[in-house]
A protein has these predicted regions:
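Phosphate-binding beta-alpha-beta segment of Rossmann-like dinucleotide-binding domains, i.e.
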Residues: 114, 119-127
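Short acidic/polar capping segments at secondary-structure boundaries
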Residues: 117-118, 151-153
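Short hydrophobic "strand-cap" motifs at the C-terminus of beta-strands
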Residues: 148, 170
């Protein structure tokens, strides 16, 4: 990712382009390395006043005092995470259908990430979510819904005007030469 550029520079440039939330997802590094990486990313986010979310790991979320944690369907149950984190942290949840979305909202999730909307290179096992199903999820809950999965400049306009709070993109930003410009272009075609 980042086309050979420095990871932290990519994050900073993406924020300058308009990113409002950064989520750090690491599956294959040690806890110590994750912690150290998260500290650096948190510092960047803090400097720019954007939210910082950790994927899956409540321990890292608490240790670096991130703004929140994002939980998938096979991660810590939302209610247990809320019991541990109290109201000090945001909790996001992945939902691929109306039932999961309503359950996440009921259990105390602050937002929902829903997808994969398009094919994605960052998650091998991601099942595609149809646009009509995404619209139904958006309309079934009162909490914000963000679309995830394979979103880039070529398909972002398909997500306009369906009630999403925002979108999540990894490769649509980091695979581009200019992360700042990639974000600006995606947002221009979404808003």
């Amino acid at each position: 990712a980042c086309s050979g550029k420095d990871f932290y520079k990519c994050i900073e440039e993406s924020i300058k382009g308009g990113v409002k939330i950064v989520q750090l997802r690491e599956k294959n590094i040690s806890t110590k390395d994750f912690y150290e990486k998260a500290l650096k990313v948190k510092e960047i986010c803090k400097n720019y006043g954007v939210l910082f979310i950790i994927n899956d790991r409540l321990d890292i979320t608490q240790a670096v005092e991130a703004d929140g944690v994002h939980l998938g369907q096979s991660d810590m149950p939302i209610e247990k995470a809320r019991e541990i984190l109290k109201d000090k942290f945001l909790i996001g949840a992945t939902a691929r259908n109306i039932e999961e979305a309503k359950k996440a909202e009921l259990l105390g999730a602050d937002y929902i990430g829903s997808g994969a909307i398009f094919g994605t290179s960052t998650k091998d096992n991601a099942k595609k979510l149809e646009m009509e199903d995404l619209k139904k999820i958006v309309n079934s809950v009162k909490i914000p819904v963000f679309a995830i999965g394979g979103i880039n400049i070529n398909n972002i306009s398909l997500l306009k005007n369906i009630g999403l709070q925002g979108i999540c993109s990894v490769s649509g930003i980091l695979s581009e030469k200019d992360c700042k410009k990639a974000v600006e272009n995606i947002l221009k075609n979404f808003n």
